[in-house]
Amino acid sequence: MLKYFSKHLGQKTFYIFTFLLTTSLFFSLIFSPVKTVASSTLRQVTKNKETKHPTDISFQSAAPNAILMEASTGTILYEKDADKEKPPASVTKIMTLLLIFDALSKKQITLNDTVTVSEHAASMGGSQVFLEPGETQTVDTMIKCIAVSSANDACVAMAEHIYGSEDAFVAKMNARAQALGMKHTHFINCCGLDAEGHYTSARDIALMSRELIIKHPDIFHYTTIWMENITHVTKRGESEFGLSNTNKLLRQYQGATGLKTGSTSKARFCLSATAERNHISLIAVVMACQSAKERVKDCASLLDY
């Protein structure tokens, strides 16, 4: 067809015709509706990526209940049955520590204050540092006993020291939980011993963990202690007692900074783990794991996600 036009139109006219034809084809391609369709598709794909739900991923935690949170923003990166209400064991102590540090920041107490151990506090079973009735320790030492060795007796002693009784302290714990939006939590005691009506969820544990580490980063001075001695001072004299951190993740995961373990026959093995990964602060919570080894493994897997 081009030979026909060249022959009958003349060379100059043919060149003009060819130019106009080429230009027409070029602009028809540029302004084709195909571009609009492609853009719409791209926007939809981008939107889907941005709104992707935390559970729509190939990774699955082995723990029955788990959650991974980015601490600075509270963004949930992963969750699995995170609102299931279960006994948390000594992970309860995160709230206890939060109230202790709140009291410190309000100048209600100081780290050098002397705490006297009551009969009730000394009678606590489970994990303890064997405080005796009438024994005195500083607030600083009591925090170490709670954060490192998960001492029930130290928890009750601090609760009584700040608010006069464990019951009054627990009421403050529940009020604080409500203020934080912890919808699946109710505390009966300050140390985490199994009790009817004492429960929380993986999501709520992450919420109170975030509040503690964001508002009171000094907690890491205690949760990163691996081993340390305290001195018992009683009527019988002085004796050394060794504290050993219950959170083995500290020695098994690079960047681990805390936070709190828990285990009872009902709660099984729980852990709220904090760590720094590539300058990002993370909180990983697992509940109802089958063993202490499994909870560490499960938290490490979450933190690696």
Segments and roles (model prediction):
Residues F14-P33:
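Sec-dependent N-terminal signal peptides of Gram-positive bacterial secreted proteins and lipoproteins
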Residues S28-S39, K266, L302:
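Domain-scale selection of a single, long terminal region
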